Every structure is written in structure tokens, then in C-alpha cells.
């Protein structure tokens, strides 16, 4: 019987053909005790959740695992793991977790059931009691029921918090519980590695090093990359190096050697000041601008094009302006010397401030030629001639609207000496004495002459080429008495005005009484229009 069982085991269990069979001590037929045990386990499995059914299937596989020994190179069933010890530990842990879950659920159910019962009791009690007062025994019973419900609520809140904490711990995937999250300080950095494979080998060339550096080939120039190289400012020699700058550098070197203290360096001129200086300085030779910092293979061509643009359009206008200068200058050659002297002083004051050196503002010149750099000749205004003698003040009105004329003074009319000759027919409206503003005109006697002064309103036409009018106060008297009469006239006019204002009083006007118009007659008013527009006004 024992041999037959061995043959059956060997027939069912696969084994390697090149090794000896290892026979286990497992029995083929189950005993009565095992059958009874399985009967009870089936009843228990009906009570437990389907999660426990999976755990109960694993012990059945354990008997099958005992028949097969875990040997390397052996043929075994694909569904069964080779390590039985690992399977046993997994099964035991799963069963333990299932039992703990069942116990926790039962406790939770009991607590919730108690709280529900206590709440139901309280509801029934208060619905029956209504508004009646409670006795001491009833108060103690209500307090006990409230304590039970409060305890269950506190325990449920604590379990929820613990469950949340467990979920946080379980959320840490691929990470231990004590591990800290990666911070910025732990960020990865680049560390170059060297190939030392040929360090131990004896090479024929001793000059070649054993290390090979990892080289970044992206920095190498290529025909398909748009690379821009900058010239170094230290190695670059300025193009505007002249004899003046060399002399200045030699002098400064000598002063340093001799120990002479250097003067403070001159301040740089701003861009706007340099532009103004370049506009004022017309004779300054235009120098080539320094090469740009960016390497441009066509920079030489660009500079030539700019020179061509600067020179060609400005050549013609300067010649035209020079022709205008020749025409303008002869007009001002006949100006007297008194007008030239103040102009010379003004020009001297303009040129007197110390002009900056040429080297200080050449680099601030704008590259493009400005339209403001054209030569413009401004016509010099000659100073006006001032009258030699001042006239005495007089209150008489003396208006003169006249042009230049050459007429000799006559006995009947007195002409002003300063009036130039006019080329038009002139009318002289002469008045011997100014009339008062208010009141009737009165004839006054002057102190110098006892005869009354009569007004002479004479219109004297004169031959001239253009039209003009001269309003002069002409008197039939000598020139010596003219100034005395003017003074007397002012006094008499002021006295007469005061008398007239004192004699006449302001008349009161009555707005209720309509005023009869003296100028308009009955025939001049159109009655039809009055009726048509009567509705627009209030009477």
C-alpha cells in the first residue's frame, strides 16, 4: 500500500528528470477527523464575510503545498508560490486583520445601537410627559441617557480622527514612515564624472593624460548657428587716436613721474549738450565713428554708405545759402557804427564762455545727419534811432497818422519836425483849443496874450502819392508861445469841467411814465410790424 501511494504521488506531482524524487509525508486520503473539521469550518464560513472565504481557501492549499518541496529547477504548479513559509505568514496576517475588523464592527454596532435606543427613549418620554414638571428620579434617568449618547459621540469622533491619521500613513507610497519629503536643499546637482579606464594602462605617449573630460559640444561654433561675438573693450584701440591725445598722454605721464598733482578730470558732456555743440561747430571735420561692438561683416560698407548720405544731399543747399549771404550782407553795410558796437559786444559775450575741447564731445555726436545742421543766416536787426529831445507834457490832444514827407512849414499851419515826408494827399484837421467834455464851448484868455484864441478848422489838401491823414493842432501864433499856451489849456479845461459838473445835477428818471421819442415821427413806425411782434414782448 505504501508503494502504491508513492507511485500515485509521483504520477500527479511533476518533477525534474535529472534529479531524485523527494517524497513528502502527506497522506492521500483525508481522515474522519479532518472531515468533521471541514464540516464545522463550512458552517463558520457561512457566517463570515466573503473576505474571510478567501482566507479559508488558503489553508486547503497548504496541504497541497506540503506535497511539493520547494527546490530550485523543479517543475511546480504555476498558481502556487514556491515559498510555503511566506504563504503561511500572509494567511495568518490576513486572518488576524479579518478578526480585528469583525470585532471593531461589532463594537461600533453596539455603541450606535445604544445611542439610538437612548435617543428613542428620551423622545418617547418627553412626548408623553409634555410640559409637566419632572421629578428627581426622572431627571436622573434623563441625565444618564444623555451621558450615554454623549460618550458614543465622543468615541466616534476619536475613531474618525484616528482613521484619518491611518489613511495619511497609508498614502505614503514608496516611502518609509520616518522619511522626510524632498526639499529644495536636496535638489539634484550636476557633478562631472571622469573616465579612468585607461589610468592603469601604460600608454606609449606619455604626454597624453589618462583622464577624458565630458565636453559640452553645444558651445562649439557651427555653420547653422547664429552666433554673435563681442570684441573685448580692453584690447580694442580707439580709431580716433590723434597727435593731440598722444601729446596729452605724454604730458600726463611726465607729470606723474615728476610728482606734480593732477588736476581734477573734466566732467563728461551730456548727450544733449554734445548735440548742441556739434550743431554750432560747422567747421568741425566729421570723423569716423568707432566700430560697433557687434561683429558685422558689412560694417565697412555701412560706414561708406553713411558717408555718402551725409555729403551728397547737403552740398547743394549750402551753396545756395552762401549765395543768399552775398545778397543779404550789402544791405547792412550802411548801418552806422553806433549800431555795430553793441552787436560786437553781444557776439563777444556769446563766444566768451569756455568751449569744451573737441575730443570731449566727438563720441557723443549722433550718427545720422540732422536737418538742423544746415547753415542759416539770420538778418541782423539794426537799432532804432531815438529822438534827441523830449517833448514837454501837455493835456491837449495831438494825434499824428502820417508818413514821410518833405513840406516846409508855413505861417498858417505848424508841422512837426519829426514827421517824415509822405507821398499822399493829406488833410489837416486842426483845432486851436481843446473843447471841454461837458457843457458849452467857452473861449478862454491866456496870460501871455489878451486877444481871444479862435479855432481854425481848415482842410488843406496837399499833393502826395499815397493817402494819409494828419491831425495836428495848428495855432496862429509863434512857436515861443506854444508851450505856455499848452500848459494854460490844461488848467482851463480842468476848471471848466469842474464848473460844469457842479452846475448840472443828474436828472431823476421815472420808469412808470413812458418817454416820448423825439427823433422818430409817426410816419417812420410800421404799425403792421408792431402788431405782428406784439405777442413776443410784454407791455
Swiss-Prot record:
It is a peripheral membrane protein. It comes from the Eukaryota. GO terms for molecular function: phospholipid binding; structural constituent of nuclear pore. Residues 91-118 form a coiled coil. Phosphorylated by CDC28. GO terms for biological process: chromosome organization; double-strand break repair; intracellular mRNA localization; mRNA export from nucleus in response to heat stress; NLS-bearing protein import into nucleus; nucleocytoplasmic transport; poly(A)+ mRNA export from nucleus; post-transcriptional tethering of RNA polymerase II gene DNA at nuclear periphery. This is Nucleoporin NUP60. It comes from Saccharomyces cerevisiae (strain ATCC 204508 / S288c). The lineage of its organism: Eukaryota, Fungi, Dikarya, Ascomycota, Saccharomycotina.
